[in-house]
Amino acid sequence: MTNPPVCNIPDRRSRFATRLPDDRAYTASHFWLLLLGEGVYRVGFTQFATRMLGDLVEHGYEVEPGAAISLGDTVGWVEAFKATTDLYCPGTGTFLEMNTALETDPTLFDSDPYGRGWLYTFFGEPDPGATDVAGYVAQLDKAIDQIMGKPHGDE
């Protein structure tokens, strides 16, 4: 059985342009969740988040595989060129694994955020507030308007 092709939804706002895979759920905190199988989710930062953070300098995890996690828990941290941030859990369940490829090639974080630059996987239930790509585009437009100092919806 082959996977259906992923449609990348283009979005352009101000000077920021991105493509968003339509096979994922997105959170207001700029994480994506990809359902890999029954209850197993891969988590990563959106391209918007990686651009705001800059190049990955260092990262770490505060939980081990098999640990119970809850929505909003801090599971790790990312230090990037422009900022440092905690990694929050966009779901509830069991932490499965971290992406060890980032240890050997940290450029994957911002060069391939929807592919090989994923952060970790978990088993459980995703954030009930996560949206489809259209909902995330609306959130992203609002965030960019705030950064640009414009009321939402102005061009």
Spell out what each predicted region is.
Residues 1-74, 85, 97-155:
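Non-catalytic terminal segments and appended small domains
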Residues 81:
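Conserved catalytic-core motifs of eukaryotic protein kinase domains, centered on the activation segment
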